[in-house]
UniProtKB/Swiss-Prot annotation:
Family: Belongs to the bacterial ribosomal protein bL33 family.
Protein name as it appears in the record: Large ribosomal subunit protein bL33
Superkingdom per UniProt: Bacteria
Any one biological process term the GO annotation gives: translation
Lineage: Bacteria, Pseudomonadati, Pseudomonadota, Betaproteobacteria, Burkholderiales
Gene of this entry: rpmG
Record-linked Pfam families: Ribosomal_L33 (PF00471)
Listed GO MF terms: structural constituent of ribosome
Length: 55
């Protein structure tokens, strides 16, 4: 079976609350690290989430 191009990643809040989302991304089309605005329920506002490697 062929291995897919998508890799699991973890998006961690930059607000320092420890909240994170998990998702996948295509390494070929998006080689850079993701930086995306998402809602942090602990901070109760939209903050930037940075990509870190899923362990």
């Amino acid at each position: 079976m062929a291995k897919g191009a998508r890799e699991k990643i973890k998006l961690e809040s930059t607000a320092g609350t420890g909240h994170f989302y998990t998702t996948t991304k295509n390494k070929k089309t998006t080689p850079d690290k993701m930086l995306i605005m998402k809602f942090d329920p602990k901070a109760r506002k939209h903050v930037e989430y940075k990509e870190i490697k899923l362990k």
